[in-house]
Amino acid sequence: MSWADLNLMPALPEIVLLIAVSAILIIDLFVKGERRGVTYLLSMLALVATGAATLAAWLPYPVLTFSGMYVADPIASVAKLGLVVATGVAMIYARQYAFDRGFLKGELFTLMLFALLGMCVMVSASHMLTLYIGLELLSLALYALIALSRESVPATEAAMKYFVLGALASGLLLYGVSMVYGGTQSLHIVAVAQSIASGNANVTLVSLGLVFIVAGLAFKLGAVPFHMWVPDVYQGAPTAVTLFVGSAPKLAAFVFVIRFLAQALEPAAVAWQPMLILLAIASLVVGNLAAIMQTNIKRMLAYSTISHMGFMLIGILAATPAGYSAAMFYAITYMLMALAGFGVLLALSRAGFDCETLDDLKGLNRKNAWYALLVLLVMFSMAGIPPLVGFYAKFAVLEAAVNVGLTWLAVVGVVMSLIGAFYYLRVVKAVYFDEATGSAGDALTVGGDMKLVLGVNGLVLLGLGILPNGLYTLCLEAVRQSLGTL
């Protein structure tokens, strides 16, 4: 392909973001302020520019470029907008916390932007190696972010665990991709699907590769039994970093799974559906039962994340447009819930004190009714209690499962959701009905921008619960326009 034939428009958001983050990295060398105001402002402007570029490049149909290795389609565009918003919110939430603990450096913002760049590459990849490159860029940025607080032993330990296990998962994924290549003679997603559908693929090699690919994907999602890193990383990393690790990458991982399973390996759905059923059930059971035993909120939310990934897998394994769109709706709403949940913990923390345990939250309503209400909104939404958006997200994926004859799996999901409600309501009980023994809510140092965004974040959970159709329709149309009628 010559430069004259190259269409750069589909990759405009990534090009804008790469130029911006490279410039910010250089400019930050000359920034002396402790609060990194210039770097922070430039990073937010970079996100605005990336969001504008995403809207400018938005098309209602897939467009391939770079010799078919890159695609701009509605799924990618919706995901990129969500990722840009999540990254901006994470930066706003993290700034004061990082300043209080001495790791507010330019690297905090530039690493988040590089992670965003990796996620954008992931969601627009139409070639398995492009997917892998985006994944590794994201992973390397996250490793560095987790270890950014160098004086923190738990953070360093968490980064090392994530790095070692992440390398293992990447190896499994690459091994599976190599087998798929051996069986189909291509790494292009469309070509792989066509080879399998036409019967020209080596079924044995593709099936073996599928096992390794699903294992690698399960690690990135944090699904059981590849979930070992999730609780340790969530608890060990600084809360400002946990906030980012536990939100935006989940949406990117969803699109990552869609590219592999719903596009490249869609003709082999009968082979990967049973594996996803096992992963979904195991994630629901282990995630909810383990969360009941936790008193550390970050660790509880880690196991909660595992159970949420189980629900998202139910939507994916339905292998229908309704199932994929329900899973996408779930991924976006989970991202919003995670941002709000960890955001409240950050707001209630201050220099010398981290709000991390149930005891810290006891009696919060008597000290700060607004933050207590935000905790209630987040916990009710995660538990799936109407009219919060979490209820409609769970309802959508369970309905998709019922519509393809997996009623028994939907019943398992409902039972696990009822069990999971216990530990969410336990947090609400501590906030509203227990005596104030913790120091959360005392001498808060929250900035006005964080107060505003956190309030909007909480109200969005309620607003999307009352009016969920707009976002769900957007997800459904994106899936239909990107994947066809399937």
Swiss-Prot record:
Transmembrane segments: 11-31, 44-64, 74-94, 103-123, 128-148, 163-183, 206-226, 238-258, 267-287, 300-320, 328-348, 371-391, 404-424, 452-472
Compartment(s) where it occurs, according to its Swiss-Prot or TrEMBL record: Cell inner membrane
GO annotations of cellular component type: plasma membrane
Entry's EC annotation: 7.1.1.-
GO molecular-function terms, A-Z: NADH dehydrogenase (ubiquinone) activity; NADH:ubiquinone reductase (non-electrogenic) activity; quinone binding
Classification via NCBIfam families: NDH_I_N, PRK05777.1-5
Name of the protein: NADH-quinone oxidoreductase subunit N
Organism from which the protein derives: Laribacter hongkongensis (strain HLHK9)
Taxonomic classification: Bacteria, Pseudomonadati, Pseudomonadota, Betaproteobacteria, Neisseriales
Gene that specifies this protein: nuoN
